[in-house]
């Protein structure tokens, strides 16, 4: 039986080992960063210990949910932070649980920028961004409530180094909490993406206009974080093709290529990119673009995400289109996803209505593993 299993494992590209810098991964199935809104008052909670440890396998790579770098970084209820001592202490047992099962765990550090409103901001001030352009109200994931956004305040040039420093300190705090590294959130219409995308960034100073100027803030964050904790512990997530939160770009391929070529200069560990087919939330669209030019240009580990199944994840690895594949919704609903992929076992269906509820169990830690259903 062991021999059969060993052979089966070898024939599944996603289940082959991979050396990511200093980290020896036993397979290529990555837990994507998933906002779950269960960190009450921005503090990670004990129920996250079980959630993350359920999704840990020996040599598996997990990316924690988006985690705010400062008190201006928040834009959703009960998302975690890492800017205070209390946050750091609350993360420690969660990180320890992942390490106890042999996992590698990175913290995704995040600033929402204009995707916020006064209610989430200190002293009810306006959210900050590269621009003063507001976002239109959006339907929440539950399809009932409407999210409203306060028009942002454009950051002055003098304020930008302070935001870069918030990312640096968040990375330092993540290391103090025991994380193996950090992923800089540069995707999905949040602050770093707002600076990069020409449909948002309307600045006329050194942080706006040309592609190089629009990417300046992102690369300053990368530089500061890499210098603080070492480039071999730093990744970044990018979505040049996506148009989330009214953050599109007129030439996404040029943006993606410029960014990966620039990232090579810093020697960071990985680049995590969203597939062009995931232009909007949760919808797979027909698309002629591919990530191959970025994949070929980037010298570190390449991670792809965006609507992958077992089949096309295996194909992407087998054909060299990516090194690792990040799974979100399927990993949320299948805590033992790598094992299910190995056995080609049926998958639990995910329940979208419980993605963002505050319940500490339902739709969070109650999805069964294969062992619990055997």
Curated annotation (Swiss-Prot):
Keyword Lipid metabolism: yes
InterPro entries, per the entry: Aldolase_TIM, OxRdtase_FMN_N, Oye-like
Pathway annotation: Lipid metabolism; oxylipin biosynthesis
Keywords annotated in UniProt: Acetylation, Cytoplasm, Fatty acid biosynthesis, Fatty acid metabolism, Flavoprotein, FMN, Lipid biosynthesis, Lipid metabolism, NADP, Oxidoreductase, Oxylipin biosynthesis
Protein localization: Cytoplasm
UniProt cofactor(s): FMN
Enzyme class: oxidoreductase
Expression sites (tissue/organ): Expressed at highest levels in roots and cotyledons, and at lower levels in leaves, shoots and flowers (sepals, petals, maturing siliques and developing pollen).
Induction (free text): By wounding, locally and systemically, by cold and heat stresses, and by UV-C. Seems to not be influenced by UV-A and UV-B. Induced by the chloroacetanilide herbicides acetochlor and metolachlor, and the explosives 2,4,6-trinitrotoluene (TNT) and hexahydro-1,3,5-trinitro-1,3,5-triazine (RDX).
Residues reported to bind substrate: 185, 277
Catalysis performed (reactions): (1S,2S)-OPC-8 + NADP(+) = (9S,13S,15Z)-12-oxophyto-10,15-dienoate + NADPH + H(+); a 4,5-didehydrojasmonate + NADPH + H(+) = a jasmonate + NADP(+)
EC number: 1.3.1.42, 1.3.1.-
Family from the record: Belongs to the NADH:flavin oxidoreductase/NADH oxidase family.
Function (record text): Specifically cleaves olefinic bonds in alpha,beta-unsaturated carbonyls and may be involved in detoxification or modification of these reactive compounds. May be involved in the biosynthesis or metabolism of oxylipin signaling molecules. In vitro, reduces 9R,13R-12-oxophytodienoic acid (9R,13R-OPDA) to 9R,13R-OPC-8:0, but only poorly 9S,13S-OPDA, the natural precursor of jasmonic acid (JA). Can detoxify the explosive 2,4,6-trinitrotoluene (TNT) in vitro and in vivo by catalyzing its nitroreduction to form hydroxylamino-dinitrotoluene (HADNT).
Name under which the protein is recorded: 12-oxophytodienoate reductase 2
């Amino acid at each position: 039986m062991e021999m059969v299993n060993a052979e089966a494992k070898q024939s599944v590209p996603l289940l082959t080992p991979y050396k990511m810098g200093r980290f020896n991964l036993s397979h290529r199935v990555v837990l994507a960063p998933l906002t779950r809104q269960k960190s009450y008052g921005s503090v990670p909670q004990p129920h996250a210990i079980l959630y993350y440890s359920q999704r840990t396998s020996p040599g598996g790579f997990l990316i924690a949910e988006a985690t705010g770098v400062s008190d201006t970084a928040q834009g959703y209820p009960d998302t975690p932070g890492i800017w205070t001592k209390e946050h750091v202490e609350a993360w420690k047992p969660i990180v320890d649980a992942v390490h106890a099962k042999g996992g590698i765990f990175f913290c995704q550090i995040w600033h929402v920028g204009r995707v916020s409103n006064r209610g989430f901001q200190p002293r009810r001030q306006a959210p900050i961004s590269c621009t003063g352009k507001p976002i239109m109200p959006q339907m929440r994931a539950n399809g009932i409530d409407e999210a409203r956004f306060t028009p942002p305040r454009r950051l002055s040039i003098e304020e930008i180094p302070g935001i870069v420093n918030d990312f640096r300190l968040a990375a330092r705090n993540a290391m103090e909490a025991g994380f193996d590294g950090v992923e800089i959130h540069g995707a999905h219409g949040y602050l770093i993406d707002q600076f990069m995308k020409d449909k948002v960034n309307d600045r006329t100073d050194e942080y706006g206009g040309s592609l190089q100027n629009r990417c300046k803030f992102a690369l300053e964050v990368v530089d500061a974080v890499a210098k603080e904790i070492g480039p071999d512990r730093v990744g970044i997530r990018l979505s040049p093709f996506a148009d989330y939160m009214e953050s599109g770009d007129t030439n996404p391929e040029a943006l993606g290529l410029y960014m990966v070529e620039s990232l090579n200069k810093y020697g960071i560990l990985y680049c995590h990119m969203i597939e062009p087919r995931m232009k909007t939330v949760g919808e797979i669209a027909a698309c002629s673009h591919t990530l191959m030019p970025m994949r070929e240009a980037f010298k570190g580990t390449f991670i792809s995400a965006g609507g992958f199944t077992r089949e096309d994840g295996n194909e992407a690895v087998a054909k060299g289109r990516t090194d690792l594949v990040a799974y979100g919704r399927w990993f949320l609903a299948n805590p033992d996803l790598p094992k299910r992929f190995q056995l080609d076992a049926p998958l639990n269906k995910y329940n979208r209505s419980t993605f963002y509820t505050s319940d500490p169990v339902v739709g969070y830690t109650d999805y069964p593993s294969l062992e619990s259903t055997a």
